[in-house]
């Protein structure tokens, strides 16, 4: 027996080790990785919190269960159920082990589930905003109330668990006794047996349950600020005047009932316990009835008047929660009275009008600039750079390795040789080549660079497509980039990675379930494994409590490529704020900057006023840096994030209204404008463009994220919503309200105007008939002074699998003028150089009469040849025919 006991503990430890083997390996690797990225203290913050919490919670659980068990055993020994039972200590030892395991398990579950809420509670930061019902700071609801709710659920669950296990224990012991004593089970004696066995214990537990029902209704009182019963989110008239009153009564009565219950136990009386439970149930049922009666017989017929103060609470706090309370609102009286001087004064804005569109440009990149089949461009970013002394908006993208495309896709190729992408491409958004393709300023491998932007180390070890580990500094040289018939190789000179000692090779062989770590002769002691290379997953691994933007963007700085990811703090616990997409508060509180070569990951706080990010900073010391610590050249490229702007636009469509009466009537609802990408195609919500523009009262151009609003379910544009992002203007928002008594074309109405123009529609029909497809680009509506200039690029795509869309024409519209031109500059000249549109139209008709028919036929011939060459992929012939067509058209002109 002693030998068996001696073997039990080591056997138990071995079983635990086997059960948690993979977790142990993963834990060791995590320690090594967090140490490598200099965030080990962040990783240990969670572990330290869990361990510190587990100790007192384990003691509480262990002692509570043990004392409860002892009290049951005392009653058992006095009762009939104990006759004939074995009285040795084996049962006590068994229960001790059981209690120890259960208490450890429960303590771990609780600590690992709620460590974060406890730390948030302890490091609470005031919002300096109070809710209008209970006058508590918002921090109470965001940082403290969630912990109270969690504790309530855990304690109620534990008390119910004790009740259930008490009944189970009684029935097991009763059944055991009856079997041993060979007596029949009498159901009539169960009530007496339970009272004798655990009457006091169950009464105490019942008293505690009633006490915590009181606490639960106190939580329900606070949760009224999230009520959805009224016409707006948050506590309504019924909630405040009926539900709240009953909740308060229930809190008081249940508190008294719990005291009465405990006193009754001391006196040995159980009837008051039943009465208290009955009263509690009656009050809970009565509350629902009372709320129903108030809502239907008092509120319903007077709803607009009674609900106004609560609607105002909802409006004010929703606007605060989504950072819409600081929008600068201005009237934009459309005059359309631009002069030539106004055009000259806004030359930088006009020179940066985007005629390249996202989707066609990405297609072109992935056909022309991937160089080799194993490269890819994941997406295109838009940014602004000073190029050769001029402020330019550009498209740019990183050329990453697509390891899934490798052929052969061997372990060495995937993890040792093709370790990184190479280079970037950049083109100005406002210019195309004579063939209608993006006009590159940075392209090719090695980079051909026409700018003053240095790119001396264009390697990409960390990116959006780098989803696998690589091993660097091996005996095999890494593939760097292709050069004619040979390949350039490279040795990694960055500091990322974990050294591949034998122990580490063994750990990763187990972790990755790959024996190659041990068998490969290419791995040296100095070799390093680089893991967590996907930039978003890397940021999430370090700071999983932040929400990350769906579109990281690249920046070229100091000769290298860097990535910027917008990080958000969110909650769904902001009082009175209407939830959107599962949240009712959001701030872009941090920017994550990642080096594409070294993998250095830095978190910069960009919104010091946000209490949630300050709460995180107190919990995770050393994680965040101040914004000023980021290099100036990086800060210049911080963008206002589109994900945030999108949700703010959605909220603004309803919450631009500040008057509760108008809000109640739903009189003034907006929606983001619709747009159409294909001629006769479906409509979709317009994608907010980043544009370079000079705000009406400003002297300098800047990049602005702009959205266009319509009246709900109408196509008339009603407002322009912009977010600024250059220099000290970063984060400022402005709303231009357009005149409601005029028809202002939205992007969709602008498309309809194009389709209804006889000259343009004929041109579009001609292109579509020639075996090609006409596609619209990205619609831009540019405010200039008190006028709106509309721009629509037109793309032509030949039929065929590998056809490339090409930007062939630009449609411009100003006031009542609509022109189809080969470029922005030509279109501007055509619109603004004619003082009398009627004379201009007459001249056009006269010039049409004098055109030589033979030249028209020749132009049509070269056009048809060009289309045929495009279909066949003969780009040399295509270019020649287009040039000939251009010469003929110039002669006609």
Curated annotation (Swiss-Prot):
Transmembrane segments annotated in the record for this chain: 9-29, 49-69, 94-114, 154-174, 202-222, 246-266, 273-293
PANTHER family: UPF0182 PROTEIN SLL1060 (PTHR39344:SF1)
Name of the molecule in the record: UPF0182 protein CLK_3152
Record InterPro entries: UPF0182
Keyword Methyltransferase belongs to the record: no
Membrane-related topology note: Multi-pass membrane protein
Secretion signal, residue range per the UniProt entry: none
UniProt keywords, alphabetically: Cell membrane, Membrane, Transmembrane, Transmembrane helix
Family membership noted in the UniProt record: Belongs to the UPF0182 family.
Record carries keyword Membrane: yes
Primary localisation category: membrane
Listed GO CC annotations: extracellular region; plasma membrane
Annotated disulfide bonds: none
Location of the protein in the cell: Cell membrane
């Amino acid at each position: 027996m002693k030998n068996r006991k001696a073997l039990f503990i080591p056997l138990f430890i071995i079983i635990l080790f086997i059960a948690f083997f993979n977790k142990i390996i993963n834990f060791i690797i995590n320690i090594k990785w967090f140490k490598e990225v200099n965030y080990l203290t962040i990783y240990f913050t969670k572990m330290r919190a869990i361990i510190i919490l587990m100790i007192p919670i384990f003691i509480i659980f262990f002692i509570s269960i043990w004392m409860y068990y002892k009290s049951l055993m005392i009653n058992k020994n006095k009762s009939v159920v104990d006759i004939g039972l074995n009285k040795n200590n084996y049962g006590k030892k068994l229960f001790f082990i059981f209690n120890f395991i259960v208490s450890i398990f429960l303590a771990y579950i609780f600590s690992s589930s709620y460590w974060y809420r406890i730390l948030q509670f302890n490091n609470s930061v005031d919002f300096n905003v109070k809710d209008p019902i209970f006058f508590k700071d918002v921090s109470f609801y965001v940082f403290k109330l969630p912990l109270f709710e969690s504790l309530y659920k855990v304690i109620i669950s534990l008390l119910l668990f004790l009740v259930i296990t008490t009944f189970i224990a009684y029935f097991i012991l009763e059944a055991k006794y009856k079997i041993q004593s060979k007596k029949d089970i009498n159901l009539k004696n169960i009530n007496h047996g339970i009272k004798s066995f655990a009457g006091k214990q169950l009464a105490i537990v019942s008293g505690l349950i009633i006490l915590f029902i009181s606490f639960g209704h106190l939580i329900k009182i606070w949760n009224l600020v999230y009520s959805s019963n009224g016409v707006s989110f948050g506590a309504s008239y019924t909630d405040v005047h009926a539900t709240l009153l009953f909740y308060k009564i229930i809190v008081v009565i249940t508190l008294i009932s719990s005291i009465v219950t405990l006193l009754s136990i001391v006196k040995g009386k159980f009837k008051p316990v039943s009465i208290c439970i009955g009263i509690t149930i009656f009050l809970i049922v009565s509350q629902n009835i009372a709320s129903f009666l108030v809502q239907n017989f008092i509120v319903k017929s007077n709803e607009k008047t009674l609900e106004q103060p609560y609607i105002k609470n909802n409006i004010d706090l929703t606007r605060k929660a989504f950072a819409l309370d600081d929008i600068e609102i201005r009237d934009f009286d459309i005059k359309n009275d631009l002069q030539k001087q106004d055009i000259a004064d806004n030359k930088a804005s006009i020179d940066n009008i985007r005629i390249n569109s996202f989707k066609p440009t990405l297609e072109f990149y992935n056909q022309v600039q991937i160089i080799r089949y194993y490269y890819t461009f994941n997406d295109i970013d838009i940014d602004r750079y000073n190029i050769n002394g001029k402020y330019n908006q550009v498209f740019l993208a990183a050329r990453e390795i697509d390891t899934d495309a490798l052929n052969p896709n061997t372990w060495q190729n995937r993890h040792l040789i093709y370790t990184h992408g190479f280079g970037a491409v950049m083109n100005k958004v406002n210019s195309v080549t004579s063939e209608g393709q993006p006009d590159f300023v940075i392209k090719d491998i090695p980079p051909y660079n026409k700018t003053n932007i240095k790119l001396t180390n264009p390697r990409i070890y960390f990116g959006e497509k780098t989803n696998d580990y690589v091993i660097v500094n091996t005996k095999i040289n890494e593939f760097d980039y292709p050069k004619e018939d040979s390949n350039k190789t490279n040795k990694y000179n960055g500091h990322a990675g974990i050294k591949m000692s034998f122990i580490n090779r063994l750990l990763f062989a187990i972790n990755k379930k790959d024996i190659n770590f041990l068998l490969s002769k290419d791995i040296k002691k100095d070799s390093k494994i680089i893991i967590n290379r996907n930039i978003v997953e890397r940021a999430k691994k370090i700071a999983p409590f932040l929400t990350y933007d769906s579109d990281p963007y690249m920046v070229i700085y100091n000769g290298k490529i860097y990535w910027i990811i917008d990080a958000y703090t969110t909650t769904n616990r902001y009082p009175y704020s209407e939830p959107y997409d599962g949240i009712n508060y959001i701030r872009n509180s941090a920017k994550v900057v990642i080096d594409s070569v070294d993998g250095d990951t830095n978190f910069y706080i960009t919104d010091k006023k946000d209490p949630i990010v300050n709460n995180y900073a107190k919990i995770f010391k050393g994680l965040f840096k101040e914004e000023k610590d980021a290099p100036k050249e990086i800060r210049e490229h911080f963008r206002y994030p589109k994900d945030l702007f999108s949700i703010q636009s959605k909220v603004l469509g309803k919450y631009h209204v500040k008057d509760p009466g108008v809000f109640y009537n739903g009189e003034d609802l907006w929606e983001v404008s619709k747009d159409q990408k294909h001629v006769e195609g479906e409509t979709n919500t317009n994608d907010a463009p980043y544009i370079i523009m000079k705000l009406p009262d400003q002297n300098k151009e800047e990049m602005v994220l702009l959205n266009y609003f319509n009246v709900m379910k109408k196509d008339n544009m009603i407002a322009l919503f912009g977010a600024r992002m250059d220099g000290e203007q970063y984060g400022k928002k402005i709303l231009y309200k357009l005149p409601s008594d005029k028809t202002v074309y939205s992007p969709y109405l602008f498309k309809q105007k194009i389709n209804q123009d006889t000259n343009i529609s004929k041109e579009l029909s001609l292109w579509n008939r020639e075996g090609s497809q006409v596609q619209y680009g990205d619609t831009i509506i540019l405010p200039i002074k008190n006028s709106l200039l509309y721009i629509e690029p037109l793309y032509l795509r030949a039929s065929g699998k590998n056809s490339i869309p090409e930007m062939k024409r630009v449609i411009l519209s100003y006031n009542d003028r609509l022109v189809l031109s080969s470029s922005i500059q030509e279109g501007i000249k055509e619109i603004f150089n004619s003082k009398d549109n009627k004379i201009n139209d007459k001249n056009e008709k006269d010039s049409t009469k004098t055109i030589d028919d033979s030249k028209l036929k020749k132009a049509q011939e070269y056009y048809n040849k060009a289309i045929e060459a495009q279909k066949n992929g003969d780009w040399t012939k295509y270019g020649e025919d287009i040039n000939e067509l251009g010469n003929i058209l110039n002669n006609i002109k």
